[in-house]
């Protein structure tokens, strides 16, 4: 699904295999699963779910039963869907003296940044770039060092992009390690049975 489209629920049920009054329960079950995430526990975005089959029992079917079944079915489908991790990208404007421009651009590139352009301003330059947010969390002291205290920057959220495989793998590994550590601290242990 294209970036920024949110959530789309498509009802392709024919023949009444799921009664119409339970379709909203199916959608709610899927929607309730989105915030929990699948990869590293981050919320899922830009998801299209198509319901095309199901079953119904006169006595045992209920709103809650359809919500639970939809959530479980959605999680099972996610294993085959190849979800990806998106990382936030910020738009950055860095003001620096002319003589520091090359070092600032080199530093932005080393942070996986994309330089979009430059504008002259007084005795310096304003460099416009897009950089993964994780790469500029502690940017101020580095910029001060590069520019001998004569540089400044502004940033704001721009959009999300697919995280490169090594970054995504690192995020997943760190999240799983943190979950295991939290489980060990609480003394709880999860077991799977077949």
Task: Annotate each language-model stretch with its function.
Residues 1-194:
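Accessory interaction regions appended to the cores of large information-processing enzymes
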């Amino acid at each position: 699904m294209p970036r920024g489209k949110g959530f789309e629920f498509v009802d392709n049920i024919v023949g009444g295999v799921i009664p119409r009054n339970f379709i909203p329960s199916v959608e709610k079950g899927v929607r309730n699963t989105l915030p929990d995430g699948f990869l590293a526990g981050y919320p899922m975005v830009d998801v299209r779910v198509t319901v095309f089959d199901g079953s119904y029992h006169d006595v045992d079917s209920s709103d809650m039963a359809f919500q639970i079944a939809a959530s479980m079915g959605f999680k099972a489908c996610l294993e085959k869907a190849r979800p990806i991790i998106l990382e936030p990208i910020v738009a950055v404007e860095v003001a620096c003296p002319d003589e520091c421009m090359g070092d600032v651009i080199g530093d932005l590139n080393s942070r996986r940044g994309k330089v979009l352009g430059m504008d002259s301003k007084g005795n310096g330059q304003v460099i416009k770039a897009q950089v993964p947010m994780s790469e500029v969390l502690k940017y101020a002291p580095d910029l001060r060092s590069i520019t001998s205290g004569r540089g400044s920057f502004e940033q704001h959220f721009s959009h999300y992009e697919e995280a490169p495989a090594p970054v995504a793998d690192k995020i997943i590994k760190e999240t799983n390690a943190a979950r295991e550590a939290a489980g060990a601290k609480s003394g709880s242990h999860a077991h799977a049975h077949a």
